[in-house]
Amino acid sequence: MKSIPRRRFLKQAGQATALGCLGTRLTAASGRIALIANPAGKLIAAPSVQWALGELRQAFEAKGASCITAATPSEAGDFSLGVIVATESAALPSEGFRLAPEIIQAKPCVRASASDTRGFVYALTELADRVRHGSDPVASLALASPLVVRPANLVRSIARAFVSEVEDKSWYYDRAFWREYLTALVVNRFNRFSLTLGLGYDFPRGVTGDYLHFAYPYLVAVPRYNVRAAPLDDAERDRNLEMLRFISEETARRGMDFQLGLWTHAYEWTDSPHSDHHILGLTPQNHGAYCRDALTLLLKTCPSIQGITFRVHGESGIPEGSYDFWRTVFEGVQRAGRPVEIDMHAKGIDNKMMDVAAATGMPVKISPKYWAEHMGLGYHQAAIRELEMPQAGHEDDPIFSLSNGSRRFLRYGYGDLFQEGRRFDVLFRMWPGTQRMLLWGDPVMAAAYGRASHFCGASGVEICEPLFFKGREGTGRPQGRCGYADESLTPKSDWQKYAYTYRLWGRLLYDPQADADQWQRHLRTEFGPAAHPLEDALAHASRVLPLLTTAHQPSASNRGSWVELPANMPIAEGQPSPYSDTPTPKRFGTVSPLDPELFASIEEHAAELLQDRRGPKYSPVEVAQFFEDTTTAAEHALEDASRQATSRTDPAFRRMEEDVRIQIGLGRFYSAKLRAGVLFEIFRKTGNLEAHGQALAAYGKARAIWAAIAERARKVYVADLTYGEIPVRRGHWLDRLPAIDRDLAAVEASRFGAGPDPTDRVLRAIAQAAGHPARTSVKCTHNPPKTFQPGSAVRLGLSVHGAATEVHLHYRRVNQAERWQSLVMKGEGSAFQATIPAAYTQSPFALQYYFELRPPKAAPTLYPGFDEFFANQPYFVVEKAI
């Protein structure tokens, strides 16, 4: 057998001059497609591989091709194109695959190879995807050279939550929905699906919509316990279990792992007179044993459940430190009689809780939040907010003794989890505080996440899908999850709006270097000639909210901050703040970045400007300038797409256009408001009326932009988009205007004691706040060590190609509970040297570091810093030698 170039591949298939006729020609016997797979092979006979073969056959037949299945090429007889499913290839890693062109029996073929069933599923669904999105099936499979791919991340998971009986029952019971949705996930190389229950509320207080919240009695009747969720009847409970079994089996049928999230173990609701259900038959005495036995029954009844996710901190309804309770519950996993993963949400975790899980002998994961409860940039924050550092005085808290006290650093980050010798894997989870509803799609940022998700040996990432919390806290509405006021925009299934988002995440978490055709083919099918400019428009617009989340975030909690539709944080002094977990005094200028190591707050930057100096951190004005640039690029691309679109009234085009326009508006609003915030801080510190006037003008501009967003969105989205009960979690852009107007009036009325006539320093500060900053660029060369030996000094060198009078090394163990250290590097010409002390490296953690450069006549800057899209890791990481 030999490889075949693409041109010859097409020619031998008889398509070199008549590709357009393929659909009719392949209906003849001589135009048959042969799927050659020997069912005697153990891997090929696996149900998931057979399912994938069926998908490929359906793709061919949908294009008018005639398909035959054979065990060998000779058995296939006459065919025009063969797809050969090869036997196991040990050279390929788990979940990797190889596609290669070959000639067999003088016929063009594609050989698909893999080392496991999941690799074969990906190979075959990749071929099917090419056929579905191609103009003809043979040309779609013409490979210029062999394609070999392998996963960058071991776990690539999507989580979908049931939080509303009103909105979620329809999709939960819809078998057709599950078949299409799960197929879309595996085609895009997700390898785990997590059905999340018990997250409708963060606390068991004020509960109304409680369906499946404490999940067991909604699913199983446990012998010897007379426990039920009144008034749920037995038939509905049994139907719920039947559907859970179906969903888990359909997930496994496609070669994916099925994970069940059980986030609530409270059975009584506090101050909840209007709850829809009441759990009967449980007492403190039988609670733990019931949960254990219910979990065992659930796992035995649904053998395709391969893991359980638990929330083990106080919001589960179980006080932190209740080790005996969790030891009892985990026995339910052990009694299932097979390996079942225990995945514990990281908040409130301590070593003793880790020991309880490890003692089961089951595989254990701990899943910290990626960027608090939001979506930041595609790296891991260099530092957590000061509010998340450990705090004394909470040891006697009856519910949150750990997560509010000594283990506070695990509330919103990975904390101290990356220790050598850990008995658990780490799986990041991206929470839905930033992107809940608007369409997102930036290949550059998705690839950055693909590179960052195996940070320090992490297993990967679970993404809470769009609409994850829609209808939470009893706010479900019958008009549908997407929230469109114009019903013509509502897709058949809610996930279909986000098909492109799923494709980017799945493909680029699997392979951050994936060929762009993997997502562009989808856009070409959907949008024809407008595909390329739409890709650019959405990518540029999608860069706004992750950067905003990283650089300026008034609340780490998704309950408090909805970045797409934020409650207005006041600029003026003394106005009521809608956010509680934010620095005091609570106003726009004091808001912390989610990464305060690399980004400056408004107050911090204004102080620098007034001291006539610039710090090395990325400033709010730099962020504002990026927003201006990326939204301009998005708008131009959207205009190109509008000119090239086959139909501007097509629902898919309109959905993308409207969401892009809203994100453009958000970027421009925050660009103006960030500048207004810096100018107001200058006014607050100096009393300078020029600063006051410019702050007022910038804020007025921001207000006009917001009003335009809101007015356009009035025709697109319903007036009350519900992701929770209180105003910060629901509403519409129009609702936010009154608070903006009140704050704008307060800014106008503000007066501070004026100093003497403005100095040049103050005027320069005002000009820089309103100007167009350009970050200092210094070319450097650095070769990071591959590993280090704990207890030995780590010597680092940096070559600076240009003037730098001083270079500082900033370093820290990969432990967010610790603070960064720094030292001045010794310079000789362009070469700088520094040593991380041996005593500091003696720890169970890897090291991370970056450089601060201070040129003689320019602002300080950072190396490696960020690239032009803020889509890289801005520091170096060195792991311990094995």
Language-model segments: which ranges?
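N-terminal secretory signal peptides and thylakoid transit peptides that target proteins
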Residues: 2-17
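C-terminal segment of N-terminal export signals and the immediately downstream linker at the start
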Residues: 23-37
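Short, charged N-terminal beta->alpha structural module
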Residues: 40-61
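Feature activates predominantly on carbohydrate-active enzymes
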Residues: 52-55, 59, 92-286, 300-304, ...
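Catalytic-core regions of glycoside hydrolase
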Residues: 61, 134-135, 191, 203-206, ...
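Short, well-ordered secondary-structure micro-motifs within conserved domains or adaptor modules
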Residues: 68-93
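C-terminal non-catalytic alpha-helical accessory regions
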Residues: 137, 465-732, 736-737
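Glycan-association/targeting regions that enable binding to alpha-glucans and other polysaccharides
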Residues: 740-882
